[in-house]
UniProtKB/Swiss-Prot annotation:
Family: Belongs to the HsdR family.
Protein name: Type I restriction enzyme HindI endonuclease subunit
Domain Helicase ATP-binding span(s) in chain numbering: 287-468
GO BP field: DNA restriction-modification system
Miscellaneous remark of the record: Type I restriction and modification enzymes are complex, multifunctional systems which require ATP, S-adenosyl methionine and magnesium as cofactors and, in addition to their endonucleolytic and methylase activities, are potent DNA-dependent ATPases.
The enzyme's E.C. designation: 3.1.21.3
Catalytic activity entry: Endonucleolytic cleavage of DNA to give random double-stranded fragments with terminal 5'-phosphates, ATP is simultaneously hydrolyzed
Superkingdom: Bacteria
Subunit structure, interactors included: The type I restriction/modification system is composed of three polypeptides R, M and S; the restriction enzyme has stoichiometry R(2)M(2)S(1) while the methyltransferase is M(2)S(1).
Role, per record: The restriction (R) subunit of a type I restriction enzyme that recognizes 5'-RAACN(5)TAG-3' and cleaves a random distance away. Subunit R is required for both nuclease and ATPase activities, but not for modification. After locating a non-methylated recognition site, the enzyme complex serves as a molecular motor that translocates DNA in an ATP-dependent manner until a collision occurs that triggers cleavage.
Keyword Flavoprotein: no
Pfam families attached to this UniProt entry: HSDR_N, SWI2_SNF2, T1R_D3-like, T1RH-like_C
SUPFAM superfamilies tied to this protein: P-loop containing nucleoside triphosphate hydrolases
Gene transcribed to yield this protein: hsdR
Amino acid sequence: MLNENDIEQLTLQRLQSLGWEYRYGKDLPVHEGKFARGDLSGVVFVEQLREAVRKLNPQLPESAVDSVVKSATKSDIGDLVVRNQTFYKLLRDGVRVEYTQNGEQKIEMVRLVDFEHWGNNRFVAVNQLEIRSRKGGKRIPDIIGFVNGLPLVVFELKNPLRESADLLQAFNQFETYKDEIAELFVYNQALIISDGIVARLGSLSADFQRFTPWKVVDEKNKSARLYFDDELQSLLNGLMQPEDLLDYIRYFVLFERDSVGKTIKKIAAYHQYYGVNEAVDSTIWATSEKGDRRIGVMWHTQGSGKSISMLFYAGKLLAQPELKNPTIVVVTDRNDLDGQLFQTFSSGKDLIKQTPQQVEDRDQLRQLLAQNEVGGVFFTTIQKFALNEEESRFPILNERNNIIVISDEAHRSQYGFTQKLHNGKFQTGYARHLRDALPNASFIGFTGTPISLEDKDTQDVFGRYVSIYDLQDAVEDGATVPIVYDDARQIRLNKKDHDALFAEIDALLEEEPSTSLRLREKLLGSQERLIELAADFVQHFAKRNEVVDSKAMMVVSSRQICVDLYNQIIALHPEWHSDNINEGAIKIVMTGSASDTPEMQKHIYSKQEKQTLERRFKDPNDPLKVVIVRDMWLTGFDAPCCNTMYLDKPMKGHNLMQAIARVNRVFANKSRENGGLIVDYVGLAKELRAATQQYTNSTGKGQLAEDVQSVFFKMKEQLEFIRTLFATPIEGKTFDVQAALEKDNPNDLLMAIRFAANHILSLDQLSFDGKAHEQHWFNKKETEPRKKAFLKTAGLVKKGYMLCGTLAEVEPYNQEIAFYDAVRAILTKREQKGTGTNERQILLKKLVNQTVYSEGVIDLFDLLEKPQPQISLLSEEFLQTVKNSPTKNLWVSAMERYLASEIKVKSGTNLTLQKDFERRLKEALNQYHNHNLTVVEILDELFKMSQDFQERLALGKKLGLTKEELAFYEALSQNQSAKDLMGDEVLSKLAKEITETLRKSVTIDWQYKEAVRARIRLLVRRALQKYKYPPDKQEEAVTYVIKQAEEIAEDLTGL
């Protein structure tokens, strides 16, 4: 069957087929030759780098080459991502060097790689390269991709057939490597984790949720999109082609500061890479003599990184020689969007290699565009293209043909060309003015939502879709999370309220310019309704936070309602209020004017204060949990930790789609199964259906939001399946869940949870007849282990509960769900080796009931009501206690986990001891799972194994051997005939002599020098002959001894 090495070899073969050289890391000498890296802690093939610098910069004297290599490989301290950013600038832009040649002082930027001609570089894939850890010992990444001797890509691979060897484990290994061999990651540009089928790509600073797949190799060929085929093959073909990798590194890497000022690294997802490259190609054509100035439309769904895609596009565009240093004008239709995009580009100014400029007013716009002759990135709202009072047509500002206009959210305001009569004059839309001002400019539209059906002329204005990445693609890839919709909480008015309000209609008709709008505001903003709304919101949000840490946006119809609702909420929770901008759990974010009332003025903030609120709301640890808005923050605003939106404002179409996308960002409190939640107070189901229809008619795939009721129904089906498992008899007895739930004594409840877990384990010991799976709701094969089916279904129930747990209909199930989760905790404990993901820690913080608690995992030793240190796992008393336990199956799992951990930890560097007991454990468990051993027999075997292991550990003391001597004694004792012939005393003397001989003979990194290894083999062979080790087994013994010596190399050299 497949193992991890098979996946490694397959990956290396594929890399070679793409043009990479291959070298086996353990064959590469550390100190000499083309693959020398200084010492065992080195990570750069210095001579390869030196050779590349000479080749790519032939004009340099040798002293300058040395200086460049030294600058590129200089060790430093400090934040790893900051160090990585420093190196990235050297890699992309070159190393600045000063030197004297023929008496002339010269300054040059020296290339480390040739981005233009990939064939001038050397691409080498190296596996099993040993790197010294800062904690001692060594770390061995599976595969490292070197370009000109620089380690730019690292792979960590796992076995697809081992359930415990998952991508999370690979990610956690990277986290360990970053700590112990940090120098390797100073140069890194891509991290890849895979089990040979599933594959994910991430940046140096990405958390696990941000590692994403690479689903297509050709964006133009949509049929090439993969679902559950070979993601690793797709990633290798899409990213690791040498030419593509250099293009990716050069144009699709971005460094930013997060909300708390920490440097983070972002790299493009595949849809950004292909979409931007297609857009750049289309731009070059559109601006050519044959082009029509229509670049196209990029539709990348909200939350999938559209703003960063625009930045990547601008960065690559500015570097294209065909465009002769173009000017980029970014146009939005709202000030807040303009500011948000400007901030994104300002943070990424290293990528565009210039400082963007935000246009302040109409006069500055005209001046900048008219005077600009080359380059520049300008941000403006389209309203600044308005006519002056005396103008009938907008004047031409610049006739250059290398001006690119990026239109964010390409909808009607961006291409309003028709005239309308206003105050006796014909007026044209702003888009007409924009094109009059820049008659030879080319246009591209970026949108996160599809263009509405009524806007038939979109492609006539911007051109075809150059890239589509719709909602279904984004959710499947993990770029966004799904949205769940709850419309069961509408707050309606009673008849008395209606009568009183409609009595005011006559007055409104005389006083208000927009009667329907003002009437709607009065209806939604009536005091009695807001009192009810505030009460419901507070109750719902509190319940939501009991399930998962949450932040929320409340969207209302007017600024006055913002203030009135705020007052109602703080009347219920006065501790949420604070006048200090840096304190308080709830704030209002809205525009203001000088004529606002004093009550409203308290909630009007300066630009700097709004930035403070943005930072606070984006910080998951900040106490600001709720913001109330009317229009602000509903488009372009990105706060990934916001997972709930309350809608109390009638919306439709484009605006509705933009708003609800605020909760679809990837974050630890959301997942593919547990997405963002939309709570509807005004009845927008019809509008949501219409928006979905608009979405799918625009060739997009995916559902905008799933009904929370459908989640509830799915959860009930899942609960029913779990009940069938407990209703399946074991030795004639079923498990009575209802009786367990009625227990109010904690000890009794704990006992019931233990019995339930034992019942699930026992199901897999039955001879299978299929009956237990007749109601298996997710239609897996009937031979699927019942424990696995329970764990999966209980996990889905938990995630479903997070979304629909606030429904009144769910309350009767609260205790039952908590009970199943407690059972799940016991069963999964042995599989949680080390730290789990954040998702595991937060998915179910506290269920809404007072009887069953599911915080943490239950320790089996606690079930014996004894402190763990007082229990001897080797005592007969303990063995009998377990044998008499009604949960023997549970103890098998506990003992398996205990022994596996003991063997791994206490064997240390003793290879023979570790392999012997790992083999025994595996064989025993196979016997048990194949029903060749009963539960009592396997317990006997595991306890006997534990005793034998302790005796082997104590053997060194008995024989008077050190740790290293014992390791060699074990290696020599693998030959039973030698042990029988020579006896313990002679073998012990031989082990001591070999240890002493090696101590005197080995040097640092001896295992990498073939001449030294040959001499060591000779010395070992002489010692074996001296003590008359059986001749027919000597070569085998030499091999064992050398392997053991390599394992304890640093102990032998005294490092």
